[in-house]
Amino acid sequence: MMAALPLVLIAAVADNGVIGDDNRLIWRLKTDLRRFRSLTLGRPVVMGRKTYLSIGKPLPGRETIVLTRDPAFRPEGVRTAADLDAALSLARQVGAAMGADSVTVAGGADVYRQVLPLADRLELTFVHARPAGDALFPEWDRSAFIADAPENHPAGPDDEHAFTFATFRRRA
C-alpha cells in the first residue's frame, strides 16, 4: 500500500496571530500569493466554506475540496465534504489520482485548528504587522516541528508589509 500523501498547512499570519477579518484577507502581498500558488498548483486544496466564499471560485489548476455542514452547498467546479476526515480522505484519493506530492490545507481558522495536530508540514508567512481582525491562527506547539531557514522579505511596491516565509516539518 502506498503511503498517504503528506498534509501541508498553508497560512499567512500577522505578528499578533490575525489571519483575517470579516472573512477576507487584510493585506496585499503579491509575493505571498505567488508562493501560495506555487505550493498548491497541481495539488488538492482543502478549505472551509467561508474561506471558499471569500475566494469566490475554484482555484485554477487545483482540485478544491470545501468543508461544509450544509449538504445543499454544491458550488460548480469544487468537491464538498461534511467533515475533516471525509475531506482529507477525498483529498488523498484525488491527489494520488492526479499525481500530486501532497495535500494542501488553506484555512480558515477552524480548519487550521483541526488540521494542526495532523499536519506533516506548515508553510507559514509571518506578516510583520498587527492588524485588527476576527480570525486568529490557533496556538501550536513549535517543539513538534523542525524549522527550515526562514526567508525574509521587505515591504515594497507589491507587498504592503515586510514578511517572512517559514517552513516547519513535523519531527519524526
Task: Give short role names for the model-derived ranges.
Residues 2-172:
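Enzymes that bind and transform nitrogen-containing heteroaromatic metabolites
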